[in-house]
């Protein structure tokens, strides 16, 4: 059975004002094309439990992996802009590998708050591997993107990187959140190139934010001792650091109200997600109009 690890495990305290009283809670926007960003949100919420969270999933344009780059940039900027007009946002987390690699410069030019992106956890995986073989499990777009190749060259040059690009796992993760069972035989078939390798990877990077939602199933299918590494806790630590050190917490707007989710189009599938979103701590939902 595989073991799930993350890029670190430290937890920072909630920010306090200089007089020792609790600070106004920051409003944090987490954005993804689908529900994969919930894996990032969950890690951030454990680190900053008192923050006010907004989660947007772009179910109208999901998935982003096969979309043209300029479409994604324009789309992400428009969505963050629409949320900016409705809420007093202190921090934006782009919880999508595809969107992060191409849209962060445009977002940082337009919005005067810290913006965090997600990249595959190749650097920690290269440190953790015992046999020097690291698997990168991601969407085809992430596997093919030059940004990913640069990460491998920079941080894992002495490792053998086995890349596996798949869109099917994204659909499986979405279905799992709807309460559907993940068919393990199908998962084994998708991972067959690694499972049949003479020496499979002993460390696997979950290079899409959807994939930690399937960690239990991946652990059941991959060889005993395989380590799963994702970026969730690293993003959470970065968010906590920014809240503590890069924001004047006394000037936060302190937006009130329940944590809220937004979709871009109301569908039966989006409505069916509400029980799961409630379990994640969201108290209301709405539709975002661009």
Curated annotation (Swiss-Prot):
Pathway: Cell wall biogenesis; peptidoglycan biosynthesis. One of its GO terms (biological process) is peptidoglycan biosynthetic process. InterPro entries: Asp/Glu/hydantoin_racemase (IPR015942), Asp/Glu_race (IPR001920), Asp/Glu_racemase_AS_1 (IPR018187), Asp/Glu_racemase_AS_2 (IPR033134), Glu_race (IPR004391). Its EC number is 5.1.1.3. One of its GO terms (molecular function) is glutamate racemase activity. It comes from the Bacteria. The keyword Disulfide bond does not apply. It catalyses: L-glutamate = D-glutamate. Substrate binds at residues 32-33, 64-65, 97-98, 209-210. Pfam families: Asp_Glu_race (PF01177). Keywords: Cell shape, Cell wall biogenesis/degradation, Isomerase, Peptidoglycan synthesis. The active site is at 96 (proton donor/acceptor), 208 (proton donor/acceptor). Provides the (R)-glutamate required for cell wall biosynthesis. Belongs to the aspartate/glutamate racemases family. This is Glutamate racemase. It comes from Sodalis glossinidius (strain morsitans).
């Amino acid at each position: 059975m595989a073991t799930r690890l993350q890029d670190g495990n430290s937890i920072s305290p909630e920010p306090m004002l200089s007089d020792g009283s609790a600070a106004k809670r920051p409003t944090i926007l987490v954005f993804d094309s689908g529900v994969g960003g919930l894996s990032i949100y969950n890690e951030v919420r454990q680190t900053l439990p008192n923050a006010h969270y907004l989660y947007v999933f772009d179910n109208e344009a999901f998935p982003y992996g096969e979309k043209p780059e300029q479409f994604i940039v324009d789309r992400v900027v428009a969505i963050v802009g629409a949320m900016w007009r409705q809420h007093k946002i202190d921090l934006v987390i782009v919880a999508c590998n595809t969107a992060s690699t191409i849209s962060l410069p445009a977002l940082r030019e337009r919005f005067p708050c810290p913006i965090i992106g997600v990249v595959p956890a190749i650097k920690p995986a290269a440190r953790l591997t015992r046999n020097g073989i690291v698997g990168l499990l991601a969407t085809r777009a992430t596997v093919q993107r030059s940004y990913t190749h640069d990460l491998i060259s920079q941080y894992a040059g002495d490792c053998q990187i086995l890349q596996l690009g798949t869109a099917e796992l994204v659909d499986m993760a979405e279905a799992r959140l709807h309460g559907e069972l993940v068919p393990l035989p199908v998962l084994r078939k998708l991972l067959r190139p690694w499972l049949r390798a003479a020496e499979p990877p002993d460390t696997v990077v979950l290079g899409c934010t959807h994939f930690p939602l399937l960690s239990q199933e991946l652990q059941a299918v991959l060889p005993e001792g395989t380590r799963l590494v994702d970026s969730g806790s690293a993003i959470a630590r970065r968010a906590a650091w920014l809240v503590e050190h890069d924001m004047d917490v006394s000037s936060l707007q302190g937006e009130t109200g329940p944590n809220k989710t937004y979709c871009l189009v109301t569908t039966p599938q989006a409505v069916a997600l509400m029980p799961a979103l409630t379990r994640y701590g969201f108290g209301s939902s709405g539709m975002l109009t661009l």
